[in-house]
From Swiss-Prot:
CDD domains: Adenylation_DNA_ligase_Arch_LigB, OBF_DNA_ligase_Arch_LigB. It comes from Methanosarcina acetivorans (strain ATCC 35395 / DSM 2834 / JCM 12185 / C2A). This is DNA ligase 2. ATP binds at residues 254, 261, 276, 306, 346, 425, 431. Disulfide bonds: none annotated. It catalyses: ATP + (deoxyribonucleotide)n-3'-hydroxyl + 5'-phospho-(deoxyribonucleotide)m = (deoxyribonucleotide)n+m + AMP + diphosphate.
Length: 568
């Protein structure tokens, strides 16, 4: 087994590195050393996650529980720990300092270490897993007991990364891109083989183990599996949609629905539904499960579509209404009657044992149509999104206007010859929408309100994502456009994510919540680490169907800024 100390030393070394290439080399060195059985665990750990994102498993450890565990392990009061965190701004550095002080005061610590076996990566994982599975009476005590064991068994440096890992935020800037390249480097396999294996498994832990054990052949043997969701292909806004359609020499035009993305896995009579964030939402949508059972005539399939909340006339309701269905855990049947769903299918990635993602869209479309049966009457609950392949710009505009008149967002413009690229955003899927510019940004800081809103968070620091460094870069603050109800909802969502100091009522927020923000323009600014600032930002809606890594990137911020200059 590989010691957790070796993992912590790698993290410490990476923290001191600014070069992506050097970081990749350090991760590759670690992966080479780790036993193949532990490789999936180490791979996820280095990306600040305990469980694979697709698994649905939640660690469920908040800051208060972590502080209590550290308090019991060290003898320091929770209040003193919170005070120290306000100074350091980091639970990891705080744990390091506390355990250093404790060890210094333990005369017999050397003999303690001799008796105590080294923590392994597997031991840390098992303790986290036991804590995550605790429920019901006594569950908090069990969680604390397992974390306390880890702190008592660790060196100060190990405690630093155990505490950060408990909050799934190592702060070392290692994301999927770095790990993907590190796997290729560590096991001398082509990066495109690693990339494709990741696309079909959605699990770099599985990919790393396969590359180590069997090289290229093992990577090529990996494929899509039912009930292991893959990332959804993404679209981007085009600055010149007409030029893009001409470049495609005919594009596939589909309505763009203002609903919630859903990935459907069917295996016999069993149906599992996953949200855009790959959360299992099957129990919240029993009516959708029955619709799939009735109308999808395939033994096994993985489908992509959009679920739209509709009124009694089949007209689309607001986006927030469908999210109420996805979030629902109780009185699900009652909610289904109050907010009926229409499912619009537009792609298929797997059919009866065959992976389809490498096929062109036109062929996937035929496969989709062959396995979905619905009449005109059925189309109120399920349909294959109507598609027209054309290069006629006037016809595209006509379809676009029809979509808007029907209450939808606009149209999708797709390359008919494109493969399905899980998790990728590019020019093969473009969207045409009305011209109000918005960005999906992550909350990284906040400030309490004033007056009657003194008990609510009133201002939010928002950031874009840098996929090259896995960091979030601030682009501004937003405090307008929110109702009291929305302020209450956001305060509840963010209350468990607060960390760091509270000077002037300002505090840091762990990057978990995504907001859609409108703005007048983007300006260059030295005030934020992104180098940009939003002018007159205002809140539009919460995007809790998106993960932080799906937020708009620093590259998109730069593109929008450049496009503004061209319009001047």
């Amino acid at each position: 087994m590989t010691s957790f100390r070796e993992f912590a030393e790698t993290c410490q070394a990476i923290e001191k590195i600014s070069s992506t290439i050097e970081t990749t080399n350090k991760v590759a060195d670690l992966l080479k050393k780790v036993d193949v059985e532990e490789l999936p665990l180490a791979t996820h750990f280095i990306m600040s996650e305990v469980f694979p994102a697709w698994s649905g498993e939640q660690l469920g450890i908040g800051t208060s529980l972590l502080y209590s565990s550290l308090s019991k392990a060290s003898g320091m009061s929770v209040r003193s720990i919170e005070s120290l965190i306000r100074t350091t701004g980091d639970i990891g550095e705080t744990a390091l300092l506390i355990l250093k002080e404790k060890r210094k005061n333990q005369v017999t610590f050397s003999s303690f270490l001799e008796e105590q076996p080294e923590l392994s990566i597997t031991e840390v994982y098992q303790r986290f897993k036991t804590a995550s599975e605790a429920s019901g009476k006594g569950s908090q005590e069990l969680k604390i007991k397992n974390l306390q064991f880890l702190f008592n068994s660790s060196t100060p440096r190990e405690a630093k990364y155990i505490s950060r890992l408990a909050l799934e935020e190592l702060r070392i800037g290692v994301g999927e891109g770095v790990v993907r390249d590190a796997i290729a480097r560590a096991f001398s396999v082509p990066s495109d083989k690693v990339e494709h294996a990741f696309m079909v498994t959605n699990d770099l832990g599985i990919v790393a183990a396969a590359a180590k054990e069997g090289g290229i052949e093992a990577l090529e043997s990996l494929g899509i599996e039912i009930n292991r969701p893959i990332k959804m292909m993404l679209s981007q806004i085009s600055p010149d949609i007409d030029a893009d359609i001409r470049d495609m020499k005919g594009a596939a035009i589909e309505w763009k629905f203002d609903g919630a993305r859903v990935q459907i896995h069917k295996n016999g009579n069993s149906v599992t539904l996953f949200s855009r964030k790959l959360e299992n939402v099957t129990n919240s949508l029993p009516d959708l499960v029955e619709i799939i059972r009735k109308h999808v005539k395939a033994e096994s399939a993985i489908l992509d579509g959009e679920a739209v909340a509709v009124d009694e006339n089949g007209k689309p309701r607001a986006f927030q209404e469908i999210l109420k269905r996805f979030r629902r855990k109780y009185d699900v049947e009652e909610k289904a009657l109050g907010i009926p769903i229409q499912l619009n299918l537009f792609d298929i990635m797997y059919l009866n044992g065959r992976t389809l993602i490498d096929l062109p869209l036109v062929e996937r479309r035929k496969a989709l149509e062959s396995c979905v049966e619905s009449s005109v009457e059925d189309s109120k609950s399920i349909s294959v999104d109507e598609q027209v392949i054309t290069g006629d710009l006037e016809l595209v505009e006509k379809i676009y206007r029809e979509a808007l008149n029907a209450g939808h967002e606009g149209v999708m413009v797709k390359n008919p010859n494109s493969a399905y690229s899980p998790g990728k955003r590019g020019k093969n899927w473009l969207k045409k929408k009305p011209l109000m510019e918005t960005l999906d940004l992550v909350v990284v800081g906040a400030e309490w309100g004033y007056g009657r809103r003194a008990n609510l968070i009133g201002s939010y620091s928002v950031a874009c994502y840098d996929p090259e460094t896995s960091r979030f870069l601030q682009v501004g603050k937003v405090g307008t456009g929110l109702t009291d109800e929305q302020l209450k909802e956001l305060t509840e969502m963010l209350s468990g994510l607060m960390e760091g100091g509270e000077a002037g009522g300002v505090f840091a927020i762990r990057p978990k919540v995504v907001l859609e923000i409108a703005f007048e323009e983007i300006q260059k600014s030295p005030n934020y680490d992104s180098g940009f600032a939003l002018r007159f930002p205002r809140f539009i809606r919460i995007r809790d169907d998106k993960d932080p890594e799906e937020a708009d990137t620093i590259q998109r911020i730069g593109r929008v800024y450049s496009q503004q200059l061209k319009r001047l």
